[in-house]
């Protein structure tokens, strides 16, 4: 399992927490685990390259991030009920109760996220940091000298608390300012069909990436969210970078309808571990809809193909397909590139039960989650 280092990091954190609290204050095991889980939640949200490497992909980091945040809420609610509620005259209890209610409110907002504007959801989400600070006040005021004198417990709690505080501070106050070192502007826009647009960007310095990766893009144009959004890289070289964006929400609709040449942008770095270059000499590519983007990136970077590739591109109707001319041209110039176009309106859905997958081939898939789950069975 390629994400084994990341899982070891999470499991070791919880085991260390259990052993430390058992040897000192076992009655506080549940809130101790909640504190560790919350700290891990903030750490996992930093998008640090080391974490992405440990978990073999940012999407896996996000999956564990969701797990630790949900686990934190469950542990805090259980702690609240086991203590008979936290309302009381002591200030420490008040801090604890405030933290729990903010956390629960954020969870409700997370479930309602698709019904509110992303920018509003993002700012509400930041209240978690305030709740985390309240929670730390609660822990240190309740535990007193056990956490204020140097011992294994105080070292463990202090270390995770400090890492959580630093991670949260970085996410909220620093990431937007220092996390996007590649500045640039839009030099060309192309509408590929009725809902998909290609963006060409000229950056202030060369951008390193590998075909199959994605990056977070910030757009500085009136009427656009200030928050960064992830998009697959569809090509580029040196200071030129391409993104292909499908209209699938408020932000992407705004890009399709209103984005203008000359607008300033910034990019953080390349993410993702679907590195086509690292695959075997015999490969199978499977793309659905806008999932063709990472493969287009590879095609643009490798005009002469040095691998045997079977490429299956599935789309629903010719009006929804993109880059068809480019694919046909590439297939003509590269005999070892076998192109299979699958129009689900005419040919039904892509099915490999009757199709032969070459032995010892690297298989890469990108597209709708339902398609990938179906083909992975």
Task: Label every model-predicted segment.
Residues 6-9, 13, 64-172, 239, ...:
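FNR/FR-type flavoprotein reductase catalytic core
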Residues 58-61, 80-88, 146-160, 178-189, ...:
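Juxtamembrane/interfacial segments around transmembrane helices
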Residues 57, 235, 276-278:
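Generic structural "secondary-structure junction" signal
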Residues 48-49, 114-115, 171-180:
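Membrane-interface capping segments at transmembrane-helix boundaries
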Residues 176-266, 308, 315-317, 328, ...:
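Ferredoxin-reductase
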Residues 37-38, 43-44, 55-56, 61, ...:
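Long, contiguous hydrophobic alpha-helical segments, chiefly transmembrane helices and signal peptides
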Residues 1-78:
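Membrane-anchoring hydrophobic segments
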């Amino acid at each position: 399992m390629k994400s084994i280092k990341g899982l070891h990091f999470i499991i070791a954190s919880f085991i260390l927490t259990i052993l430390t609290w058992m040897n000192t204050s076992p009655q506080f095991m549940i809130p101790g685990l909640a504190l560790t889980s919350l700290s891990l939640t903030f750490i996992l949200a930093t998008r640090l390259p080391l974490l992405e490497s440990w978990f073999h992909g940012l999407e896996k980091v996000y999956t564990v991030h969701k797990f630790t945040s949900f686990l934190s809420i469950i542990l805090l609610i259980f702690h609240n009920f086991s203590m008979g509620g936290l309302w009381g005259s002591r200030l420490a209890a008040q801090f604890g109760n405030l933290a729990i209610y903010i956390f629960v409110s954020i969870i409700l907002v997370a479930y309602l996220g698709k019904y509110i504007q992303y920018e509003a959801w993002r700012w509400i989400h930041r209240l978690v940091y305030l709740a985390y600070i309240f929670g730390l006040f609660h822990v240190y005021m309740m535990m007193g000298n056990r956490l204020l004198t140097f011992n294994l417990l105080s070292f463990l709690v202090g270390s995770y608390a400090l890492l959580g505080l630093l991670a949260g501070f970085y996410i909220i106050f620093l990431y937007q300012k220092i996390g996007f070192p590649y500045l640039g502007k839009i030099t060309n826009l192309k509408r590929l069909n009725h809902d998909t647009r290609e963006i060409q960007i000229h950056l202030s310095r060369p951008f390193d990436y590998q075909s199959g990766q994605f990056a977070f893009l910030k757009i500085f144009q009136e009427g656009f969210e200030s928050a960064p959004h992830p998009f697959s890289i569809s090509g580029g070289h040196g200071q030129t970078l391409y993104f292909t964006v499908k209209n699938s929400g408020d932000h992407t609709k705004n890009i399709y309808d209103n984005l203008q040449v000359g607008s300033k942008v910034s990019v953080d770095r390349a993410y993702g571990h679907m590195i086509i270059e690292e695959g075997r000499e015999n490969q199978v590519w499977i793309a659905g809809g806008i999932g063709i983007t990472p493969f287009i990136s590879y095609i643009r970077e490798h005009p002469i193909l040095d691998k045997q590739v079977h490429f299956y591109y599935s789309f629903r109707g010719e009006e929804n397909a993109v880059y068809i001319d480019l694919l046909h041209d590439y297939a003509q110039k590269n005999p070892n590139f076998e192109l299979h176009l699958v129009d689900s309106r005419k040919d039904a859905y892509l099915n490999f039960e009757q199709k032969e997958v070459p032995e010892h081939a690297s298989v890469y898939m990108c597209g709708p989650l339902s398609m990938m789950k179906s083909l992975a069975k």
